[in-house]
Curated annotation (Swiss-Prot):
The gene is GPC6. It comes from Pongo abelii. Cell surface proteoglycan that bears heparan sulfate. Putative cell surface coreceptor for growth factors, extracellular matrix proteins, proteases and anti-proteases. Enhances migration and invasion of cancer cells through WNT5A signaling. Residues 1-23 form the signal peptide. Belongs to the glypican family. The keyword Lipoprotein applies. GO terms for cellular component: cell surface; extracellular region; lysosomal lumen; plasma membrane; side of membrane; synapse. This is Glypican-6. Pfam families: Glypican. It comes from the Eukaryota. It is found in: Cell membrane. One of its GO terms (biological process) is regulation of neurotransmitter receptor localization to postsynaptic specialization membrane. Residues 348-376 are annotated as: Disordered.
Amino acid sequence: MPSWIGAVILPLLGLLLSLPAGADVKARSCGEVRQAYGAKGFSLADIPYQEIAGEHLRICPQEYTCCTTEMEDKLSQQSKLEFENLVEETSHFVRTTFVSRHKKFDEFFRELLENAEKSLNDMFVRTYGMLYMQNSEVFQDLFTELKRYYTGGNVNLEEMLNDFWARLLERMFQLINPQYHFSEDYLECVSKYTDQLKPFGDVPRKLKIQVTRAFIAARTFVQGLTVGREVANRVSKVSPTPGCIRALMKMLYCPYCRGLPTVRPCNNYCLNVMKGCLANQADLDTEWNLFIDAMLLVAERLEGPFNIESVMDPIDVKISEAIMNMQENSMQVSAKVFQGCGQPKPAPALRSARSAPENFNTRFRPYNPEERPTTAAGTSLDRLVTDIKEKLKLSKKVWSSLPYTICKDESMTAGTSNEEECWNGHSKARYLPEIMNDGLTNQINNPEVDVDITRPDTFIRQQIMALRVMTNKLKNAYNGNDVNFQDTSDESSGSGSGSGCIDDVCPTEFEFVTTEAPAVDPDRREVDSSAAQRGHSLLSWSLTCIVLALQRLCR
């Protein structure tokens, strides 16, 4: 064979071998792709009837293709929208759990307070009549403050309850001693004997413990449901990065461009794409799981010793027992008060005579439990807590499991049983790269998504901080302590640029304010405070002098 024939035939053979399969005479038809593309709601004017050269493609393989530049752009945007919807749908359970249970618990607690107030009012009107109605604002104020505390008001429960018993003592002391006139100063002196005389027996002490820890647990638990709801709602609204959008397009719609619209992504391929796109969400999981554990701890308290229903339901009877105790010991109480505060002035004869029949000698009448209002919100706290505990347990690890939940959907991938007939990002074949671990730092070698592991998502970090703050509150509530965090920024708003703090790098700027008020006389608080400050200053000065002296000796 002449040498020139070989020089011509060999290049021709190479050209033929480089052509796509089926492109021996003419390009393949794009009919199947046109049908699938049109079903997505796109105009068929964008798509060619036959494959064209793919040098214009920016994401998909630049081979013969059914995609124009316009199609690639539209399908890229479509993949972004579908991904956002997928994440919202997949996190639907956790979001609805917190939304619906917050509503139920909030309704229950509010109605419980309303029922308790109504029950006390009905009982006291029936038992004490006009005497109660003339002094009803003392009890109304008690419930107003309890409601204000529950709804987030700055109320110190212990101080508020102490004030209630002091006011009640002042009113009752006047009623059991109608023959005397008491000035405001005298009544203030009377109230100072509340702790010393214990006119109401042990009821105030027990009720203070029960009410304080029950309300702390109830309020903090509902706040926890609020934070969980807000975090879940915010995190489920993802904003994919350009690198993520590129990977989504390549996985979901590059099969269209290759003329394979019915071929679904390989399962492991899908996992790597989702782990790259949801790397920051996975990092939320650690703090989220700690938050869920803390919620479960407080839930146990709610159905146990901190059960607000068991505290509020009989509160009218308990206060009546306290009043009865005061009546029975009225002589001794009056004598000790007169001894400590001095003999009061007699009341005018006309007033004394008119008040005599109205003195507080009505005896306590046991209240029939059958007369109590129906259970708050048509349910009981035990049933609510049992339900929420099950739901909370199911919501653990929800964020790190998002990729697995999304990729196991039959409409999303070819499944694990069809690993040879799936889209691997380049062709219909097995996906070979290994699956990445969860979290941002593990995506450094992700083969599908370009992830900058040095730039954590600020928005997700804000949610991590919100969960961390709430978890601390819940732990304190579990121990019966009320901690109010007074932060300069909204702890869970997610607004603004954020701190960008990771884990414990940034210091928290929270001031702890507890309901455990120090047992200090009100008149001495300023003195003690300034004395403490002077003491600290003196101590600091003394230590400085000692250090300087030691330094001189060492020389």
